[in-house]
Amino acid sequence: MFDSLVDFLKTNIDELNGHEVRISSEFKEHHNEDSKYIIKNWLFSSPEYRKWRITRLDGGKKLQVFNTVAYPNFDCEMPILGADILWFGTSQKLLAILDYQPLIQEGKYLEKYCSSLGIIKKKYSAFDNNKMKNIYDSKKYFSPWVIICRGNKLNLDRDLNNIFHSFVNNYLKIHKSNPVNQFLDTEKIKINQIKYDKYSFEKDPADKLFKSFFGEKWTKKFVNKFLFTLNNEIIY
């Protein structure tokens, strides 16, 4: 499950003249002690994106997880693309959160880079779950148009691929239009990406999930050295 999303991203990254970055074997593929859960990771870089990572967690019929985060270069003020998709097989429930995660919460910045998410949401009513917005801090790294779905197998089979493709294609379209930086210079972009990693290191709900499956020692290393590598950077 979700392999088609991985393949879709790989194709798009390849078209961006991206290349896969070698990562530690313990992150590339890792099994828990009884081999019920397997996590696989990929890391890419391209001329426009300093880091684009993908994570797939295979828990068999019980749980499937897909995550991707794309960080633009420090000379681009665009939001960070972030997607979390979880399928709970036992309860047949889909949870998806897709967003262009803004570096700042200024209204004109949000309108320029994030508002087009609203058009995508209108096409898929199941992915417009405002009731769940309270679980995220809207004053930090989430846009007012964050796409949230708490759906079922119909949404998984019928809608997910289409909305994910629209979500990624629209983001790439914005980037390819070469928007001029209006709000942040290179130094501030870097600082805000560092702050994003520090915030995510503290708040990411997946941390508990990984600890329960793969243990605290491996998870701590994984979060610091693969997921949020700027967490240890010092801001002067």
UniProtKB/Swiss-Prot annotation:
Species this protein is from: Prochlorococcus marinus (strain MIT 9215)
Catalytic activity as recorded in UniProt: 15,16-dihydrobiliverdin + oxidized 2[4Fe-4S]-[ferredoxin] = biliverdin IXalpha + reduced 2[4Fe-4S]-[ferredoxin] + 2 H(+)
Catalytic activity, EC: 1.3.7.2
Alphabetical UniProt keywords: Oxidoreductase
PANTHER family for the chain: PHYTOCHROMOBILIN:FERREDOXIN OXIDOREDUCTASE, CHLOROPLASTIC
Similarity annotation: Belongs to the HY2 family.
Descriptive protein name: 15,16-dihydrobiliverdin:ferredoxin oxidoreductase
Top EC class, one word: oxidoreductase
Highest rank taxon of the organism: Bacteria
Gene name linked to the record: pebA
Single GO BP term: phytochromobilin biosynthetic process
GO molecular function: 15,16-dihydrobiliverdin:ferredoxin oxidoreductase activity; cobalt ion binding
Primary role: Catalyzes the two-electron reduction of biliverdin IX-alpha at the C15 methine bridge.
InterPro entries membership: DiHydbiliverdin_OxRdtase, Ferredoxin-dep_bilin_Rdtase
One matching Pfam family: Fe_bilin_red
